[in-house]
């Protein structure tokens, strides 16, 4: 009876079991959970933004190169040639020249693979042959390129609207007013400059609106509510795409 009581007592069995075996069992249970409970397909599906890696890298490289070129042209070159310091331009003016260049280049990368794919199909003589791996990967990331293009375009619009809030711009207005008084000019109106800026702003607003329309219709919940003809007209129709570009 005493031995049977010891055997049926769970606490005694736990104490009687060697510690090494307990650690081995814990290790096996952990290894079992890591190996079978989380397969490789699920681990791949849980990666952080896998389709955004390539577009973000390309956008970062383009933005860095464009920033360096603009910095050399707008700041370093005047400093080296005429000893004029324009470092105050870096936070707003230099950045605002980088944003539209990157945005329009990313937008071009959205529609360029479609043209390349058509050329490849003509070269192969059929549309049922698989595309090269690099082209297939590029076409799968067109949505991400388009959203990044919209992101840089919105930033460009915000930076442009902030021009009038800069302290340097206010000082320039005072200098222009003083120069106008010194030159005895009652009216500083320049017709072609006015028309040029009005057209620039108008086309920028229209382009941003169309780009936002394309981005909204690419959302799955919105695209599912559209018919195939409506989606094809907005996303694939060449006139809207090239008008945006």
Swiss-Prot record:
Membrane topology value: Multi-pass membrane protein
Main location: membrane
GO cellular component: endosome; plasma membrane
Pfam families in alphabetical order: Ferric_reduct (PF01794)
Signal peptide interval: none
Subcellular location: Membrane
Bilayer-crossing regions: 52-72, 100-120, 145-165, 199-219
Alphabetical UniProt keywords: Membrane, Transmembrane, Transmembrane helix
Family: Belongs to the STEAP family.
Protein name stated in the entry: STEAP family member 1B
Organism: Homo sapiens (Human)
Gene assigned in the entry: STEAP1B
């Amino acid at each position: 009876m005493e031995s049977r009581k010891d055997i049926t007592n769970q606490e005694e069995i736990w104490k009687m079991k060697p510690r090494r075996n307990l650690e081995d069992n814990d290790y096996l249970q952990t290894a079992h959970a890591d190996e079978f409970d989380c397969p490789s397909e699920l681990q791949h599906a849980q990666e952080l933004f896998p389709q955004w890696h390539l577009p973000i890298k390309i956008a970062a490289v383009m933005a860095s190169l464009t920033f360096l070129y603009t910095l050399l042209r707008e700041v370093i070159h005047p400093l080296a040639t005429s000893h004029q310091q324009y470092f105050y331009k870096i936070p707003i003016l230099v950045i605002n020249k980088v944003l539209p260049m990157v945005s329009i280049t990313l937008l071009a990368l959205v529609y360029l693979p479609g043209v390349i794919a058509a050329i490849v199909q003509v070269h192969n003589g059929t549309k049922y042959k698989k595309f090269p791996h690099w082209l297939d990967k590029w076409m799968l990331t067109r949505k991400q390129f388009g959203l990044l293009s919209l992101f840089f375009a919105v930033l460009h619009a915000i930076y442009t609207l902030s021009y009038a809030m800069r302290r340097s711009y206010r000082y320039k207005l005072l200098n222009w007013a003083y120069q106008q008084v010194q030159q005895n000019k009652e009216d500083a109106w320049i017709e072609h400059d006015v028309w040029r800026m009005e057209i620039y702003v108008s086309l920028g607003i229209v382009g941003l609106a169309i780009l936002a329309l394309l981005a909204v219709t690419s959302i799955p919940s919105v695209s599912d509510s559209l018919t195939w003809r409506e989606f094809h007209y907005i996303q694939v129709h060449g006139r809207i795409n090239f008008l945006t570009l």
